[in-house]
Amino acid sequence: MKYVGAHVSASGGVENAVKNAVDIGANGFALFTKNQRQWVAKPLSEKSINKFKELMEEHGFIADGVLPHDSYLINLGHPEEDKREKSYNAFVDEIRRVEQLGLKYLNFHPGSHLKKISEEECLDLISENINRAIKDTEYATLVLETTAGQGSNLGYKFEHLAYIIDNIEDKSRIGVCIDTAHIFAAGYDIRTKEAYEKTMQEFDEIVGFKYLKGMHINDSKAKFASRVDRHHSLGKGEIGIDAFKFIMQDSRIDNIPLVLETIEPEIWADEIKLLKSFENV
């Protein structure tokens, strides 16, 4: 069983994300629990929280199939302490929101060194802040996302994720999300069966499938190993459709959210149907 959906809008209240997921025939989804381009947001209302939980139950969604994403502003590895602290406080707020909604995961981009400190120093700061955040919150698993390596973003090598995980004290609360467009742009090929197996074996050896808590399912406008982050609709980009068949037929990827962040929301329902059609081939 795979939880297939898209990153749906929660505009007008988090409960609307559930309705939007239902509308596209999803059995999993991603959402922002607040405006992703603002540092501070009003707390979630009791009414919104209850309605969200009610709709989740009514439509048969479970927490295992939902992958909330934090704000793009947050940088846990920021070289400047005051800005890092601002990011940390926003991150903890995001985790608490997820926990209020009864969800399990918070997906986030590891962080950026902004060309002011070394990669290792930045990875140490990220690890330190994750450890702090785990102590300051209750139970949610914090899910590091693979990145394309654009600019000074870390997370474009499996080794970056492994380094962070190694430094986490409570490993039951850390995980990883593979974004297909990002890994492809970072130089991990998945276009043929052989390339896919090689990349997944590398992931397993360096990070470990036990840490895989979700995937972002995207084709790529950017060329292989370009270190450029540009998503495309399935089969229309540089990756091609076969990679998504391999994913849907891979039992190591069962029971986690597979979330579309492709560029044409109007065809998400079709893309979900397409992915599900690959599952039992």
UniProtKB/Swiss-Prot annotation:
<dbReference type="Pfam" id="PF01261">
    <property type="entry name" value="AP_endonuc_2"/>
</dbReference>
<keyword id="KW-0255">Endonuclease</keyword>
<feature type="binding site">
    <location>
        <position position="231"/>
    </location>
    <ligand>
        <name>Zn(2+) 3</name>
    </ligand>
</feature>
<feature type="binding site">
    <location>
        <position position="229"/>
    </location>
    <ligand>
        <name>Zn(2+) 3</name>
    </ligand>
</feature>
<keyword id="KW-0227">DNA damage</keyword>
<feature type="binding site">
    <location>
        <position position="145"/>
    </location>
    <ligand>
        <name>Zn(2+) 2</name>
    </ligand>
</feature>
<protein>
    <recommendedName>
        <fullName>Probable endonuclease 4</fullName>
        <ecNumber>3.1.21.2</ecNumber>
    </recommendedName>
</protein>
<dbReference type="GO" id="GO:0008270">
    <property type="term" value="F:zinc ion binding"/>
</dbReference>
<feature type="binding site">
    <location>
        <position position="216"/>
    </location>
    <ligand>
        <name>Zn(2+) 2</name>
    </ligand>
</feature>
<feature type="binding site">
    <location>
        <position position="69"/>
    </location>
    <ligand>
        <name>Zn(2+) 1</name>
    </ligand>
</feature>
<keyword id="KW-0862">Zinc</keyword>
<dbReference type="InterPro" id="IPR036237">
    <property type="entry name" value="Xyl_isomerase-like_sf"/>
</dbReference>
<feature type="binding site">
    <location>
        <position position="261"/>
    </location>
    <ligand>
        <name>Zn(2+) 2</name>
    </ligand>
</feature>
<comment type="function">
    <text>Endonuclease IV plays a role in DNA repair. It cleaves phosphodiester bonds at apurinic or apyrimidinic (AP) sites, generating a 3'-hydroxyl group and a 5'-terminal sugar phosphate.</text>
</comment>
<comment type="similarity">
    <text>Belongs to the AP endonuclease 2 family.</text>
</comment>
<dbReference type="GO" id="GO:0008833">
    <property type="term" value="F:deoxyribonuclease IV (phage-T4-induced) activity"/>
</dbReference>
<dbReference type="InterPro" id="IPR001719">
    <property type="entry name" value="AP_endonuc_2"/>
</dbReference>
<dbReference type="GO" id="GO:0003906">
    <property type="term" value="F:DNA-(apurinic or apyrimidinic site) endonuclease activity"/>
</dbReference>
<dbReference type="GO" id="GO:0003677">
    <property type="term" value="F:DNA binding"/>
</dbReference>
<keyword id="KW-0234">DNA repair</keyword>
<feature type="binding site">
    <location>
        <position position="182"/>
    </location>
    <ligand>
        <name>Zn(2+) 3</name>
    </ligand>
</feature>
<dbReference type="InterPro" id="IPR013022">
    <property type="entry name" value="Xyl_isomerase-like_TIM-brl"/>
</dbReference>
<feature type="binding site">
    <location>
        <position position="179"/>
    </location>
    <ligand>
        <name>Zn(2+) 2</name>
    </ligand>
</feature>
<keyword id="KW-0479">Metal-binding</keyword>
<keyword id="KW-0540">Nuclease</keyword>
<dbReference type="GO" id="GO:0008081">
    <property type="term" value="F:phosphoric diester hydrolase activity"/>
</dbReference>
<keyword id="KW-0378">Hydrolase</keyword>
<dbReference type="InterPro" id="IPR018246">
    <property type="entry name" value="AP_endonuc_F2_Zn_BS"/>
</dbReference>
<feature type="binding site">
    <location>
        <position position="109"/>
    </location>
    <ligand>
        <name>Zn(2+) 1</name>
    </ligand>
</feature>
<dbReference type="GO" id="GO:0006284">
    <property type="term" value="P:base-excision repair"/>
</dbReference>
<feature type="binding site">
    <location>
        <position position="145"/>
    </location>
    <ligand>
        <name>Zn(2+) 1</name>
    </ligand>
</feature>
